[in-house]
Structures are given as C-alpha cells and as structure tokens.
Amino acid sequence: MIVTTTPGIEGRRISAYHGVVTGETIIGANIFRDIFAGIRDIVGGRAGAYESALASARETALSEMQDRARQLGGNAVVGVDLDYEVINNMLMVSASGTAVSVE
C-alpha cells in the first residue's frame, strides 16, 4: 500500500476516493516511567528507548490506518498527517489520511 503525505501520487491516477481513514495508539503512563528509569541509554543526546517507543506507536497508528483503508477498498492513502498529543500522562499518536484507489 502506498502511503504519502502529498495529495496525490506522481505518475499514478486516483480512480476513486473512499473517505477519511484514521489510526490511533496510546502509550500509557507506565511506558514513560520505564523510559525515564532507563534514561542511562541516552547516547549522543538521544534517548533510544523513548525513540523506540515513539517509533512503535507511530507504526501501529499507520498500520491501523492502512487496515481501515483496505477495508474500504483502497490501495493507497494520501494526505497523511501524524499528530502527537499528551492526554493525562499518556501520549496519543494518531494518523489520518484519505483512502484512495490508484491505477
């Protein structure tokens, strides 16, 4: 499945729009405690465990969004936007875009 932040896919024609699709995931408060407890893994000013947790959450949100696009009959998602929001000591990662069929 093609996933892009752009409104179209160069060299491909959008033949159908299937609607907005989203995917969300939440990292709970315990993950923050665990990450900060393991802060000693910081190398070069970067927290590896924290980056890994964020990457995993982002991939989960994107995967969920792609699954929803497939359910609607799409083979691509355009106009993808990723948002990160802190809610009551939890981090929500959400992905949204438009499911489309491309030729």
From Swiss-Prot:
At the top level of its lineage, which domain of life is listed? Bacteria
Question: One Pfam family for this entry, by name?
Answer: YbjQ_1
What Gene3D superfamilies does the database record attribute to this sequence? Hypothetical protein apc22750. Chain B
InterPro entries under this entry?
UPF0145_dom_sf, UPF0145_YbjQ-like
PANTHER family hit by this protein: UPF0145 PROTEIN YBJQ
Q: Which family does it belong to?
A: Belongs to the UPF0145 family.
What's this protein's name? UPF0145 protein Pden_3965
Organism for this UniProt entry: Paracoccus denitrificans (strain Pd 1222)
